[in-house]
UniProtKB/Swiss-Prot annotation:
GO CC aspect terms: cytoplasm
Motif (Gly-cisPro motif, important for rejection of L-amino acids) on chain: 136-137
Organism (species): Staphylococcus aureus (strain MRSA252)
Gene Ontology molecular function terms on file: D-tyrosyl-tRNA(Tyr) deacylase activity; Gly-tRNA(Ala) deacylase activity; Ser(Gly)-tRNA(Ala) hydrolase activity; tRNA binding
Pfam family, one: Tyr_Deacylase
Enzyme class: hydrolase
Role this protein plays: An aminoacyl-tRNA editing enzyme that deacylates mischarged D-aminoacyl-tRNAs. Also deacylates mischarged glycyl-tRNA(Ala), protecting cells against glycine mischarging by AlaRS. Acts via tRNA-based rather than protein-based catalysis; rejects L-amino acids rather than detecting D-amino acids in the active site. By recycling D-aminoacyl-tRNA to D-amino acids and free tRNA molecules, this enzyme counteracts the toxicity associated with the formation of D-aminoacyl-tRNA entities in vivo and helps enforce protein L-homochirality.
Stored InterPro entries: Daa-tRNA_deacyls_DTD, DTD-like_sf
Gene: dtd
Origin organism lineage: Bacteria, Bacillati, Bacillota, Bacilli, Bacillales
Name of this protein: D-aminoacyl-tRNA deacylase
UniProt domain comment: A Gly-cisPro motif from one monomer fits into the active site of the other monomer to allow specific chiral rejection of L-amino acids.
Compartment annotation: Cytoplasm
Family: Belongs to the DTD family.
Length: 150
């Protein structure tokens, strides 16, 4: 499982049926790979909930999202598992089947909520417009395999 965390001043996701937005917090781009499990979702959710990605008065990254009353916008992103080794068109065989991936994606979002976080989401498996107003920028990539952070 791969999650790109971007610290944002604001972010939104829209399509024909959806309009979700947050102010200060994280925009998460969430990729579910062939081998991704609920254990991977758990360890990444814990890391994100406790990650100190906001500055204190000395410009040190000392505050987590809860301490800043931030929110999360979680967007599924199967293209994080693109295979670009051959040719010019990416392949996506490393991404988990959508029927299985959506279950892990929803489990992951619920795991974040279990830490008391406000989580808004995109719509799994649809084309969306994602607007991200980065803060910093601060961008961290979390990867887990076999329930362990890589």
């Amino acid at each position: 499982m791969k999650v790109v965390v971007q610290r944002v001043k604001e972010a939104s996701v829209t399509n024909d049926t959806l309009n979700n937005q947050i102010k200060k917090g994280y925009c998460l781009l969430v990729g579910i790979g062939q081998d991704s499990t609920e254990q991977d979702a758990d360890v990444i959710a814990k890391k994100i909930a406790n990650a100190r990605l906001f500055e204190d008065d000395n410009n040190k990254l000392n505050f987590n999202i809860q301490q800043m009353n931030g929110e999360i916008l979680s967007v599924s992103q199967f293209t994080l598992y693109a295979d670009v080794k051959k040719g010019n068109r990416p392949g996506f065989s490393n991404s988990k089947n959508p029927d299985q991936a959506v279950k892990i994606y929803e489990y992951f979002n619920d795991a974040l909520r279990a830490y008391g976080l406000t989580v808004k989401t995109g719509e799994f498996g649809t084309h969306m417009n994602v607007n991200i107003n980065n803060d910093g920028p601060v961008t961290i990539i979390y990867e887990s395999q076999d329930g362990k952070i890589q």
